Curated annotation (Swiss-Prot):
Miscellaneous note of the record: The gene coding for this protein is located in the pseudoautosomal region 1 (PAR1) of X and Y chromosomes.
Domain annotation Fibronectin type-III: ranges: 220-320
Alphabetical keyword list: Cell membrane, Disease variant, Disulfide bond, Glycoprotein, Membrane, Receptor, Secreted, Signal, Transmembrane, Transmembrane helix
Topology in the lipid bilayer: Single-pass type I membrane protein
Annotated transmembrane regions: 321-346
A single GO molecular function term of this UniProt record: signaling receptor activity
The protein's name in its UniProt record: Granulocyte-macrophage colony-stimulating factor receptor subunit alpha
Organism: Homo sapiens
Glycan-bearing residues: N46, N54, N99, N123, N135, N182, N195, N223, N229, N272, N305
InterPro entries: FN3_dom, FN3_sf, Ig-like_fold, IL3Ra_N, Short_hematopoietin_rcpt_2_CS, TypeI_recpt_CBD
Span of the annotated motif Box 1 motif: 355-363
Signal peptide interval: 1-22
Segments in the Extracellular topological domain: 23-320
Domain topic, free-text comment: The WSXWS motif appears to be necessary for proper protein folding and thereby efficient intracellular transport and cell-surface receptor binding.
Amino acid sequence: MLLLVTSLLLCELPHPAFLLIPEKSDLRTVAPASSLNVRFDSRTMNLSWDCQENTTFSKCFLTDKKNRVVEPRLSNNECSCTFREICLHEGVTFEVHVNTSQRGFQQKLLYPNSGREGTAAQNFSCFIYNADLMNCTWARGPTAPRDVQYFLYIRNSKRRREIRCPYYIQDSGTHVGCHLDNLSGLTSRNYFLVNGTSREIGIQFFDSLLDTKKIERFNPPSNVTVRCNTTHCLVRWKQPRTYQKLSYLDFQYQLDVHRKNTQPGTENLLINVSGDLENRYNFPSSEPRAKHSVKIRAADVRILNWSSWSEAIEFGSDDGNLGSVYIYVLLIVGTLVCGIVLGFLFKRFLRIQRLFPPVPQIKDKLNDNHEVEDEIIWEEFTPEEGKGYREEVLTVKEIT
């Protein structure tokens, strides 16, 4: 019994060789891949990750739903990148690639537009007017709940300043527009974000990039004047004030010279005039001229988003419209004068006949034959040349 116990104890003791030689395994040990901890800040549009030691290469890019790739420039020692010209409301995928002297790292980050589909603001648009004011409008999403509320945020291209809407336009208590009377914080290109909130469900956001040159609506030209001489008319106007800093070469104008009292359906030809230092247009118009009106509108020569028409300026005279009427009046007056003259002559002729009636002809009572000539031409009975009249005597004897 003692021998059995002793043998069992000896079997449980570790083998001396096991204590001196480390255990070897046939399976290769693989270290778990460390995460780059990629993160994205939508306010600054900055994508960042944890820096790795001995980095030899790194890049970042995004892919949208249309498989378009945007890759900003990045140096090897940077651990972040910033995206400037992107919209996120359709959902994007960020991806970071980093290589070190020992291994490579890759990580993706999905950035979806969380919330119920169709709850985001729709039909978003903005326009600048009067050089200092801007209106933005949008519509409620078709699947948005009744208690939805939208909020507008604007960031300039440098992402250094965020503008919140100061004055909202409401429809049944829901924000559907925004009015801004101070545009000092805007740059040439700006990022617009419309967020939504609701107690019932999540609301998707909408974002857009807008260029101030494309959304500005010019005021019509001012100080429009027209001066005419006997043969020409000269139109002058003043360049409209704009939010952008533009020279006269950046403008294109259209003139609508319209003649008054024309037949309905008559189309007027629009006259295109390039911007000029003096802003003038000279066209032939001889006197007498009918009454006309002229109005002008302006646009950026690169975009041609036309302004409204200026107030119509009239020139010419209503008497000018009688140019063609004069002909008809002269014809009528001439006809009347001729009629009066003819009537006067006719009456005078009647008076003359009354004063000097015609002498009646002597009637031939012996011969009622009307075929006999009333007038005898004695020349027909001229004697023969060299002969005189001969008298013949006829003697009549009475026989018993």
